[in-house]
Amino acid sequence: MDARSELHHYNPYRVFSRSEWANLRQDTPMTLDLAEVSTLRSLHDRLDITEVEEIYLPMSRLLSIHVGAMQQLYYAQRRFLGVVERKMPYIIGVAGSVAVGKSTTARVLQALLARWSPRPKVDLITTDGFLHPNALLERAGLMQKKGFPESYDLPALLAFLSDIKSGRRKVRAPIYSHLTYDIVPNKFAVVDRPDILIVEGVNVLQTGRLPRDGKAVPVVSDFFDFSVYIDADEPVLRDWYIRRFLALRDTAFHDPRSYFHRYAPLSDEEATATAIAIWERTNLANLEDNILPTRPRATLILKKGADHVVDSVALRRL
């Protein structure tokens, strides 16, 4: 067996071309119209009916199979244990770099899954709400590492997911403002026993250090039943980030309340240079050191090309 064949032999993923993946939709119905699809698209991301039909409907079909199998396993284990336990929410993690389109993917999945029959309750939260407040990050000298694992209140995020998975009612999650670039004081989203919870964030597949004393060290992905990593080559991600920064300079940055209001008067050349500096100082380092190494932990990998369209899909073998 040559080196290439050996690598393929031990590859834990089955890789599909776009057309191969699209064929797996079969008769899954399209439940979103053009207007709804438009509202799900993030700034400077690309999403159209064709992308939903060829990429997300097969995902919806696959997830319906996984959720159904998990429900059967739940009832079988309940019979085995001889106890009556509250049914646990199915949790899906969505990971990937800044500017890759995580929010769009998470919202499309939420919209499609909520239209299954019978209509499940599908909630969505982002881990941005579990970032430490800016004041704390500034005191700790971590503002330049915002989005890195150390910038999150990990105990609070783990406690939130533990409460969700145990079936607690009305669990609160902090709310983050992208306008002020900070946690909104005394504002919370309430998650109340959803059937499915989607958790979106750059580092949700992050692993922890192995304990030397044998004690369990929980990580966020311990609570996931399924996970999606959205992938793209670094030069493509860099270009998307610059384009998004320029678009925000012309829109949201003009709001005096914006944390980035100081960038609104910049010329195209100045704004591009600023975006490149931020990308290289923060986002590229986070991608290389923390985000990309977690890609092999995902159940499903969506690989995007320069046009924001998914070119291939990798599904972890069972």
Swiss-Prot record:
One GO term of the biological process aspect: coenzyme A biosynthetic process
Pathway this chain belongs to: Cofactor biosynthesis; coenzyme A biosynthesis; CoA from (R)-pantothenate: step 1/5
Subcellular location(s) per record: Cytoplasm
Keyword Transferase belongs to the record: yes
Keywords: ATP-binding, Coenzyme A biosynthesis, Cytoplasm, Kinase, Nucleotide-binding, Transferase
Claim: Transferase is one of the keywords in the record: yes
GO molecular function: ATP binding; pantothenate kinase activity
Entry GO terms, CC: cytoplasm
UniProt superkingdom: Bacteria
Coiled coil: none
CDD domains to which the protein is assigned, alphabetical: PanK
Database matches in Pfam families: PRK (PF00485)
Catalytic reaction(s) noted: (R)-pantothenate + ATP = (R)-4'-phosphopantothenate + ADP + H(+)
Family statement drawn from the similarity comment of this UniProt entry: Belongs to the prokaryotic pantothenate kinase family.
Descriptive protein name: Pantothenate kinase
Organism of derivation: Rhodopseudomonas palustris (strain BisB5)
